[in-house]
A protein has these predicted regions:
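Residue-level marker of positions within ordered structural domains that often coincide
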Residues: 1, 12, 34, 127, ...
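Start-transfer (signal-anchor) and selected internal transmembrane alpha helices
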Residues: 1-27, 42-103
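Intramembrane catalytic core of multi-pass membrane enzymes that act on lipidic substrates
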Residues: 87-186
Length: 204
């Protein structure tokens, strides 16, 4: 167990915390334009300010990518305060991670629409069909809230996910029903805790 950070190191740690938080906020804002927003039940639909990033997608993608790079650098910078004779406390680390997690927790999915396929297959499991035999379209119907957000390439495709993930997904589906926003949030919280992944991965 190392000694607490001195004043100079503490100020440097706070700058690193702010740097990482800025990166995650950039990712969250950029995801409003470059992210994989749901086709229906989009809570930002009709909100003029929140829909602005979708009209400047190149800028949004740049913001998201810049934020991701900043987040990766912040992780590396944070490491210096977790090693050596003087280290940040557990509470300081927890506050830092929480600050970095929140923007990514509420941001739209980024870089991939896989989460919608996962939610659709989880719903198929919940209603008693075999997700390894039917895809979202034949299992739920083309007009189902989850199917509509699944890329057309995968709407007929059976589940590629393992039994454990589908079991977890069935529980999420039972809890959230057809509320796609609540399902995405639960998916992020539950699966990432189980997988033990970094906050930077929470937006997937």
């Amino acid at each position: 167990m190392g000694s607490p950070l001195n004043d100079v190191e503490y100020r440097a740690m706070r700058r690193t915390r702010l740097f990482g938080a800025t990166g995650t906020v950039l990712m969250g804002i950029g995801a409003l334009g470059a992210g994989a927003r749901p086709v229906v039940q989009d809570p930002t639909f009709g909100v003029r300010l929140l829909n602005l990033p979708s009209r400047i997608q190149t800028v949004s993608l740049t913001m998201t990518t810049t934020g991701a790079v900043m987040m990766a650098l912040a992780w590396l910078m944070l490491g210096r305060f977790a090693l050596g004779s003087r280290r940040m406390s557990r509470s300081q680390l927890d506050r830092t991670l929480l600050l970095w997690m929140v923007p990514l927790l509420i941001a739209p999915p980024m870089y991939s629409k896989d989460v919608y396929s996962y939610l659709a297959q989880s719903q198929i499991t919940r209603i008693g069909l075999n997700p390894y035999e039917v895809g979202p379209a034949p299992g739920l119907g083309l007009d189902h809230v989850f199917t509509l957000s699944v890329p057309s390439l995968w709407r007929e495709t059976p589940a590629p996910y393992g039994a454990l993930l589908l079991w977890i997904g069935r529980g999420i589906s039972a809890l959230t029903g057809e509320n796609i926003v609540a399902a995405v949030l639960c998916h992020r919280v539950v699966v990432r805790i189980v997988a033990g992944q970094r906050p930077a991965d929470w937006a997937r």
